[in-house]
Every structure is written in C-alpha cells, then in structure tokens.
C-alpha cells in the first residue's frame, strides 16, 4: 500500500493492531491516510437498535418505539455476543432486527466518505479495520454495531 510522504505503519501493543504515524506532524490514526487526489471512503454494514430517546423513535419494524436506551443497549450487546461467538452474522441479525431501512440489504450502507454520517458513527467506522466489528456506538439515531467491509 502506498502511503503519503512522511507516513509510516507502526504496531500498537495495547490494541495489537497496526496504525499509521506521521513522522513530521506526530499525528497517529487507525485509518490509512490517503494520497492527494484520492477520496477517503469506507464501506460498512450496521445493526441499529432505536429507543424512545432516538431522534426518530420509529422504524420499518415498529411505528412507536417505547424501549429505553438501556433496553436498546442490552438487545445490541446480546447481538454482539452472538456475532463474536460465531452463532450469528451481523447481516442475518440486521435483516431481522435492525431499526434501519438498510435491514433489507443485511445492514449494508454501501460506500461513504467523511462528513456523510453522524460524527460518532463516522469516527467509529473509519477507526475499524476491514472485517472488524465495533463495540456499541451511540448516535442520535440509537445504538449501532458496525462492521467495516471495505
């Protein structure tokens, strides 16, 4: 992989994964810096569980969502354990349980660039390695599990 000038790959012992470091500015980041002229974009799938505190507490599955944020997080963490243990896939769970309309695509959001998603969602997605599953991520929409796919 070609990196812009002054960028190198280092390994984090704490997180046991590679990251990118700029030897001039001392900036470090999980996502690869892009060469000039390239757009920085990722592809991800997600599973969204909304609560009554969500900015739009309704979905294709439920007209009026009444669960609390705590209940939404419990549902999502149960799904997270099923995915991490290999019992389920994010795609299958998203298809059946996600409160996002992307459920009909197994949670696939397609490619997106910085500035197109809510900031916490964007930051979490760009910090993931391809194939890596996030921990629960809160946005105004609800709580998400995110799988970076490209």
Swiss-Prot record:
Pfam families: Rotamase, WW. Transmembrane segments: none annotated. GO terms for molecular function: chromatin-protein adaptor activity; peptidyl-prolyl cis-trans isomerase activity; RNA polymerase II complex binding. The keyword Mitochondrion does not apply. GO terms for cellular component: cytosol; nucleus. Its main location: nucleus. Signal peptide: none annotated. Its EC number is 5.2.1.8. PPIases accelerate the folding of proteins. It catalyzes the cis-trans isomerization of proline imidic peptide bonds in oligopeptides. Catalyzes pSer/Thr-Pro cis/trans isomerizations. Belongs to the PpiC/parvulin rotamase family. This is Peptidyl-prolyl cis-trans isomerase pin1. The gene is pin1.
